[in-house]
Regions:
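Positively charged n-region of N-terminal signal peptides that target proteins for export
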Residues: 1-6
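Bacterial N-terminal signal peptides
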Residues: 8-18
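Glycoside hydrolase catalytic-domain context in secreted enzymes
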Residues: 19-381
Length: 381
């Protein structure tokens, strides 16, 4: 009983400090129990950066390579569970089973109602957590949404996934939806919203190697704006590059990923994932490099933290990164930086912490397609 009271009081203190403008510390409820943890990274009272550093220091190089793939294996000797990036959540999660379906993104944007859109994002985030409760290994909380591609051409077959041709409206609606997905807790993330597709992605024909030509003014005043809005407002915590090239360089290798997205907009606790089969596409589609070792090395250097390729089969990713290490194209330090970004997000989801500290761990399958969410869907339609 006293333990529960301490947790409640200390949790309230974290919320008060956050409201006062302080960076919320890790929930301090477990601080007096630090000796109970086998490793420091398991201690919720420590700052994220210290937990990440401790965890990385305990991984072998082989384990680090394995954790660079979308389907990250468990590391049983350290008590690290398996983790999967990527749950589609554009306007619901009905692809996982019976769930609430909200109007397509294009229709939602026409409401011009930030509050309503945030409510919808929150409902979808709840249902993501509900499916995660049913099967944590299959249903991850890293959501690949919202889509903030600007709708330049009505002939594009994916226009219904985006919000508008207007960068301001797209940025505001994306921020509202991602804020709902993220949740309102000062530390824990309900889900990890990941914006896509960066950058200038507006065609399906030859999308794997076509190049979008953009002058500097249009780049900064138009194409980058919706991404900047959602990321700088701390609504989104992830980014996915597009398949296409921009000015003849594959978007997955864009220098903007590091120089602009990570360093100027995002700050701490942010990661970049590739689109499916895009890493191997650097060689197979773009023909930009002649080996997967070179392609993966340059992708890591550009800012890619996690590789989505070959479905659940990590062999290509592991072989390419292992070869890149042997050839001196990347170092273990490069992998550490990428994994630090990924694990900073994983710690924010609460997967390493006691359930009583994370309010979103209480969301079960009861929230999926609930009457409350059905009414919200009806209102939004």
């Amino acid at each position: 009983m006293l333990k529960t009271v301490r947790i409640i009081i200390l949790g309230a203190m974290c919320t008060i400090l956050s409201a006062a403008g302080f960076d919320p510390p890790q929930p301090a409820a477990a601080k007096s129990q630090a000796d109970e943890y086998e490793y420091p990274f398991q201690d919720p009272s420590l700052p994220v950066q210290k937990r990440v550093s401790d965890l990385l220091s305990r991984l072998t190089l082989e384990e680090k390579v394995s954790l660079m793939h979308q389907y990250q294996p468990a590391v049983p000797r350290l008590g690290i569970p398996a983790f999967k990036t990527g749950t589609e959540a554009l306007h619901g999660v009905a692809w996982l089973g019976e769930a609430t379906v909200f109007p397509q993104a294009f229709g939602l944007a026409h409401t011009w109602d930030r509050y309503l859109i945030k409510q919808i994002g929150s409902a979808v985030g709840d249902e993501v957590r509900g499916f995660h409760h049913l099967d944590p290994a299959a249903n991850g909380v890293n959501v690949w949404a919202p889509v903030v591609d600007l709708l330049r051409d009505p002939r594009w077959g994916r226009n219904e996934e985006g919000y508008s041709e207007d960068p301001f409206l797209t940025g505001e609606i994306a921020t509202a939806y991602a804020s709902g997905l993220r949740g309102d807790h000062p530390f824990y993330l309900k889900t990890v919203p990941t914006l896509k597709h960066f950058l200038a992605y507006n065609n399906e024909t030859d999308r794997g190697f076509s190049s979008s030509s953009i002058d500097p003014r249009n780049m900064h005043e138009y194409y980058l704006k919706p991404f900047e809005t959602a990321i700088s407002k701390k609504a989104a915590y992830g980014l996915m590059p597009a398949y296409n090239s921009v000015n003849d360089k594959p978007a997955i290798l864009s220098p903007l990923l590091d120089s602009t997205v990570k360093r100027r907009w995002a700050g701490d606790d942010f990661f970049i994932v590739s689109d499916a089969f895009d890493p191997s596409g650097i060689v197979n589609d773009h023909k930009y490099y002649d080996s997967h070792e070179k392609a993966h090395a340059h992708a890591v250097k550009a800012g890619i933290d996690n590789f989505t390729d070959q479905g659940e089969n990590p062999e290509l990713t592991r072989n390419a990164l292992t070869g890149a290490l042997k050839q001196g194209l990347i170092s273990e330090k490069d992998l550490d930086q990428a994994l630090a970004n990924t694990f900073s997000i994983r710690f924010r989801t609460g997967e390493f912490d006691p359930d009583e500290l994370n309010p979103y761990s209480r969301l079960t399958d009861d929230v999926i397609n609930s009457p409350k969410h059905q009414l919200l869907a009806k209102k939004s339609g």
